[in-house]
């Protein structure tokens, strides 16, 4: 079998596969985040074929799905998929605030699109300079091109002015930076 690293102080036994660093599980998670079939992601050849082989990947993906079904376990992505499937049950909302929007995956953007139709006001906050989850399927370009009124904060309240000024030096050298 595949040894899975896990860490969850509340329920290790049922969540061990969610926080692993195994390349098979990472690829399965990325396919879910990208909202594509695992075979499609495999065929993109973005992985090391010496490490990940189609046979075991297909088996692990189907076994994981069955394991979660039998044990009535849902991970975060399963919750998102359930909301998408049952969108007619989502009530009308006054406002929604989504932070770190630069790190949303296509699956999460699909839910955002549904929530837009269910709310009066939607606020997205994020910083494309801080997009760090492309490896997991995050779609920073969707964040950048999302229509709406854009407010760019010129000053950070998280770091000192001196640190901010120094960080602007390398950022300003990047072509196409906003």
Where do the model's predicted regions map?
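Conserved helicase motor core of SF1/SF2 NTP-dependent helicases
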Residues: 95, 102-178
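Accessory N-terminal region flanking or inserted into the helicase ATPase core
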Residues: 3-97, 106-111, 134
């Amino acid at each position: 079998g595949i040894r899975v690293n896990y860490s969850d102080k509340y329920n290790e036994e049922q969540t061990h596969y969610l926080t692993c660093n195994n390349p098979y599980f990472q690829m399965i998670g990325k396919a879910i985040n990208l909202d594509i079939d695992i075979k499609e992601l495999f065929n993109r050849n973005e992985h090391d074929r010496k490490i990940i082989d189609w046979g075991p990947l297909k088996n692990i993906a189907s076994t994981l799905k069955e394991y979660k079904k039998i044990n009535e376990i849902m991970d975060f992505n399963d919750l998102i998929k359930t909301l998408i499937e049952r969108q007619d049950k989502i009530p009308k909302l006054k406002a929604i605030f989504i932070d770190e929007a630069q790190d949303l995956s296509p699956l999460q953007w699909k839910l955002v699109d549904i929530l837009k139709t269910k709310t009066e006001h939607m606020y997205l906050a994020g910083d494309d300079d801080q997009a760090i989850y492309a490896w997991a399927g995050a779609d920073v370009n969707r964040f950048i091109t999302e229509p709406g009124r854009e407010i760019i904060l010129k000053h950070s309240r998280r770091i000192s002015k001196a640190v901010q000024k120094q960080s602007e030096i390398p950022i300003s050298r990047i072509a196409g930076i906003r």
